[in-house]
Each structure stands twice: as C-alpha cells, then as structure tokens.
Amino acid sequence: MDGHADKNNEVETAGGHRARLRRRLLDAGPKAFHDYELVEYLLALTIPRVDTKPLAKRLLHDFGGIGPLLSASADTLRREGLTDPTIAALKIADATALRLLESRIKDKPVLSSSDALGEYLHAAMAHARVEEVRVLFLNAKNMLIANEALWQGSVDEASVHVREVIARAIALSATAIIIVHNHPSGDPSPSNQDIRLTRDLVEAGRHMKVTVHDHVIVGVEGRTSMRAMGLI
C-alpha cells in the first residue's frame, strides 16, 4: 500500500510541476525558461506521469546543448533510448524553429537580410554531424527562389559539384547563388578544397551569367564569408 501511495504521489508531483511550467510559459513566455526546462516540457508531451527533468538535463549534457539535441537524427535519438513519439516532439520543435528563421529571409532581398540569413544558416547547419552543401538560388532582385541541400559529404570533387550547381541554377532561372556548407569540426575556416570550389564556381558562373554572391562556411564556432575574405 505504501509503495502504491508513493507512486501516486510521484505522479501528482510530476503533474503539478508540469502545470506550473505551463502556467509560467503562458504568463512569462519561453524566454523565462532555461534550456533544460524547454526540453523537459517537450519530453513531457509524450512521456506521461514521469518527471522528465533528469532526462532533459542528461540529453543536453550528452549532446552538448539544445541545438545539437534538436538537430540530431532520429536514429541518433533512438540510440539514446527515446521513443518515436518523443523524437517526433523534438523534431517538430526543430522544424518549427527553422521554418521561422527561414521565413525571415523570404520575400525580401537576401543580401539586405544578412543577419537573418546568418541566424538561419547557423541553426540549420552548424550542428550537423556530416558535411552538407546547400545552395540558395536567387532571382535578378536577389529574392530567394529556392533553398536546396544538393549533396552531403566532402567538397573534394569540385568539378562535379560545380556542374551540378550551375545546371540547377539554370534550370531554376536563377541569376545568382549563395553556396553554403558546414564544417562538422566546428571550425569555419576554409580549406584549400573550399577555396578551389569557390573559384571554380565563380568562373563557371561567369560563363553562364550566374553570379556567385558568396560561399559561406558554417560551424559551431561561427561562420566565414569567402566574399568578406576577399576570395570572391
């Protein structure tokens, strides 16, 4: 009987804590929450009658922060023992945040929204564990036509990638592009391959009347602009 009573007390305590979190969220907004409380609340949506604070803190510790946690793949999260409903709750939060940031660079000239663009690119790519190359295709007014991840992996095969990027730009009737890729190491410094790819893209684009505005490298330590470095 005592064990059953203790269990009921735990459930009631967890329920009361969640109600207090919900009230604080509605009254003060998400800025009043620590990262672990945001994750705790997300976990509580799919893990009933359990105190999710310890799990939230463990996940943040294991992944190194809320960004790497939310951007982790479903398979990686499963290896942490999370169920699919819980993984879906984390991924929908990640997708919503990215969609919000992406909305800030739509319907306006991308080059005049550099801060918003940087925030979006960092959120979308900085915490990825594999290298990804993304291209922003722009029209003559530098408005975003398409935002596409073209490939994952090394940029070593520069000539193949150059043809793919320029061909896609022509197919979309884009007049300019911004190429972006991440460094999973965290260091956004360009490699020799990055510099070579940039120069090859600029040259190929010139022949096909596609302007390469920039090549941005993103890492958890920051981001690097090839144009700002004088490489374009």
Annotate each predicted stretch with a short phrase.
Residues 199-232:
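Divalent-metal-activated hydrolytic enzyme cores
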Residues 152-191:
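Short HxH-centered metal-ligating active-site micro-motif
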Residues 1-76:
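Long, highly charged, low-complexity intrinsically disordered interaction regions
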Residues 31, 175-176, 211:
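Short acidic/polar active-site loop segments enriched in Thr and Asp
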